Amino acid sequence: MVTLRIFVFFFSVHGALAGFDQYSALVTADPPGSQQVPGTVRVTYLGVNGYQFEANGHALLVDPYFTRAGLTAIAFQRRLEPNETRISFGLRHVRPRVDAVLVTHSHFDHLLDVPEIMKRTNARLIAGATAVNLMMSCGLDRSLVVEPGFTRAIGPWRIRVLPSAHDRIFGWLPFRGTKTHPGTCPAKASDWRLGEPMAFLIEASGKRIYVDSGGTPEVQLPPQVTPVDLAILGVALPDSRRRLRATIERLRPKYVLPSHQDDFFSPVERGFVFGKLTDFPGVMRPFQRHEITSHLILLDYFRPWTIP
């Protein structure tokens, strides 16, 4: 029954809408080939909910996932392996050394590639206990367990961990559960348990960035969190879209970047395509009506953008 439910859900996502063509006015990027200006923060979208942030010669990654396993492998619980060719392609757009990888929760589309990326970039993992135990199960122990309220300075970055939640899919919470100790490296999608969802406030060079993969809870954020320069907010499912306006009102961002809305079964080389369960016209509507005054933007794969 669970497998059937997974298949029905992922089949519905696999059907896709158009790409960015009709929204080209919202797509922002630095001029091609331009170098980052010292003292700025640059953002590169890596696909799904993956991002690279750069400041003062340092890099930070959030939820990097390049393998983009196929629909049938997920739905029928086949063995998942990181695709080293696709990881190599993705890492061509990432600095060779990374200070840390932050993970918002432990599902495969956020964590599967992290062991290989940690090995190649010498990064450490900052994540919840389940994610760290899964990484230790795969032979990686360069990790730091965090929970909401945690703060840490790493290089130019100041990182604050905030509470979050995961969207429900037709009332169902996918692959729920935690992992309290290391064991066997996960083999299939359902082995990558949800764990402890979290959001991050990242500060560097005078800029403040809020990152969540979706499901931002309706809680009052600490006063020192807002306002932010950029809010990256997952909008893959109706749950998070229903809360989007309230989240924006709490965060008071200059820029809003909707995230986790691409077809993550399709390789990035094929270009950005919206997943079928997304509703970008609905996301865009209150901005068009000037009901939300923040600037709505989109980022395309691997095209860096410097936060003004």
Kindly label every feature range from the protein language model.
Residues M136-T151, E249, K254-P308:
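Binuclear metal-ion centers of metallo-dependent hydrolases, dominated by the metallo-beta-lactamase
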Residues M1-F9:
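Sec-dependent signal peptide recognition
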Residues T28-Q36, H58-L102, H107, P115-E116, ...:
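Pre-active-site segment of Zn-dependent metallo-hydrolases
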Residues N49, A69, S106-L111, V132-M135, ...:
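Active-site environment of divalent metal-dependent phosphoester hydrolases
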Residues Q36-V41, E54-L60, T151-R160, E203-I209:
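Beta-strand-turn-beta hairpins that frame and shape the catalytic cleft
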Residues V62-D63, R97-H107, I126-G128, Y210-G215, ...:
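Active-site neighborhood of phospho(di)ester-bond hydrolases with catalytic His/Asp-centered motifs
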Residues L71-T72, F89-R152, W157-P174:
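Active-site HxH/HxHxD metal-binding segment of metal-dependent hydrolases
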Residues P182-R250:
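Active-site-proximal loop/helix segments of hydrolase catalytic cores
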